[in-house]
Curated annotation (Swiss-Prot):
GO cellular component: membrane
Gene: US17
Keyword terms of this UniProt record: Glycoprotein, Membrane, Transmembrane, Transmembrane helix
Species assigned in the record: Human cytomegalovirus (strain AD169) (HHV-5)
Subcellular location: Membrane
Alphabetized InterPro entries for the sequence: Bax_inhibitor_1-related
Record-stated family: Belongs to the cytomegalovirus US12 family.
Highest taxon of source: Viruses
Main location: membrane
Membrane-spanning parts: 55-75, 77-97, 110-130, 138-158, 164-184, 193-213, 226-246
Protein name: Uncharacterized protein HVLF1
Glycan attachment points: 287
Topological category with respect to the lipid bilayer: Multi-pass membrane protein
Length: 293
């Protein structure tokens, strides 16, 4: 019996044991934490399934029809990969337009989200048809790595403003260093401008992906489908930008050949009646290469 318990007449009970360091008490995990974990699992599993199916369809099309990049006219002009960015750009603008003062308005119907997803997937497949299987595979893997890196950065920084400042500073330094290195490369000015433009677009999309990932800590369960589609759009946008970066030089040469072909048709210098569009563009490109050499 404790002296205090004798004075008060109550039975003395030993204090509860303190948990040792490194031991997580089950009671410290709240219902909100469990719900947030399930929400993250739902979002990322859906994005993973969508992204995997899209990349497999792209790779399957390229392997099944490897001649498309040499026979489809838009592929021969170099327009197809940049044109494919229009669909995810419009979809992302519409999806982010659903936000109102920092929170989503009423979530769109599942049918509308499905339409967005199908249109984006088709644009990615069409753009991949103008590339090789090696480029499709490498671009898809690199896009997944960058997307995962954005998720890791978001989880590492959390709500710590100091960490965000360090991450943003390192990111800006990396972008500036890349642009300086690109400027010092012995390549034509047109190639530098195209590469610099798409590199800046890729940097911007990384920022957008990190921003969308931070919303995992804010949204409700009913808004998960909308955020899932946003992250999927970000993933395929990264893939398309990487694909364009690896094919910029070839696309620029094709574009110059196409413009030369148009000018020759306008002046009547070329008889295109007996030659297909792609064959004619390849002939013009070979002539330009010999002239520049």
């Amino acid at each position: 019996m404790s002296p205090n318990s004798e004075a008060t007449g109550t039975a003395w009970a030993p204090p509860p044991p303190r948990p040792s360091r490194g031991v997580i008490m089950i009671s410290s995990v709240s219902t909100n934490d469990v719900r947030r974990f399930l929400l993250c699992m739902r979002v990322y599993s859906t994005v993973a399934v969508q992204g995997t199916c899209t990349f497999l369809l792209c790779l399957g099309l390229v392997l099944a029809f490897p001649h498309l990049k040499g026979t489809v006219f838009l592929c021969c002009t170099g327009f197809m990969p940049p044109l494919s960015l229009m669909v995810p750009t419009i979809c992302l603008a519409l999806l982010h337009g659903k936000r109102d003062e920092g929170s989503f308005t009423s979530p769109p119907s599942p049918g509308l989200l499905t339409i967005y997803s199908v249109l984006t997937t088709l644009s990615v497949i069409v753009a991949s048809a103008c590339s090789s299987s090696t480029l499709v595979t490498f671009s898809g893997l690199l896009a997944c790595v960058l997307f995962s890196l954005c998720s890791c950065v978001t989880g590492l920084a959390g709500h710590n403003h100091r960490r965000w400042q360090v991450i943003v500073t390192l990111f800006v330094i990396g972008v500036i260093a890349f642009l300086i290195a690109l400027y010092l490369q012995p390549v034509p000015l047109g190639h530098k401008l195209f590469l610099g433009y798409y590199a800046m677009a890729l940097s911007f999309m990384l920022v957008v992906t990190v921003f969308d990932t931070t919303r995992l800590f804010e949204i409700a369960w009913s808004e998960a489908d909308l955020l899932t589609l946003c992250l999927y759009e970000n993933l395929v946008y990264l893939y398309l930008l990487i694909l364009i970066l690896f094919t910029t030089e070839d696309s620029l040469d094709k574009l110059i050949a196409w413009m030369t072909w148009l000018s020759s048709r306008a002046t009547g210098a070329t008889n295109a009646a007996s030659i297909s569009g792609c064959d004619l563009l390849r002939e013009v490109q070979r002539n330009l290469t010999r002239t520049m050499a």
